[in-house]
């Protein structure tokens, strides 16, 4: 965010996330819920929700080490999609978009998966991994920052459109 905005604050929303529907719709609806939950008079809010989809299943953040291991097992050796829904809420409008990137995991054995989870503790990451760790991902297509969790290039374009950044 520092490469887009000079000043910002991070606020944790209290909104309850939805988890039923198409992955791009879920990510977008959750971003809108987060933005509305955090909105205060006169503020500009940028909210994002990122999730992973593979073989018809949606993977958010794991709640336990065991669920992180299970998620990575299911993604191992496969292509999957990373969807980030973004809502930019200004005092007079909401601008929303969804960014999709594709990721191919390395084919990992159980020992590699357990070692990864123990070393990186990815409990705060959709799909139980961080591409920036450089361990589990074989290749990707699309915006690297989107896979990290915020599609910075598209966000910058939206902020320019609404005359919030130069």
Give the residues covered by each predicted segment.
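A short beta-strand-loop structural module common to alpha/beta enzyme folds
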Residues: 7-19
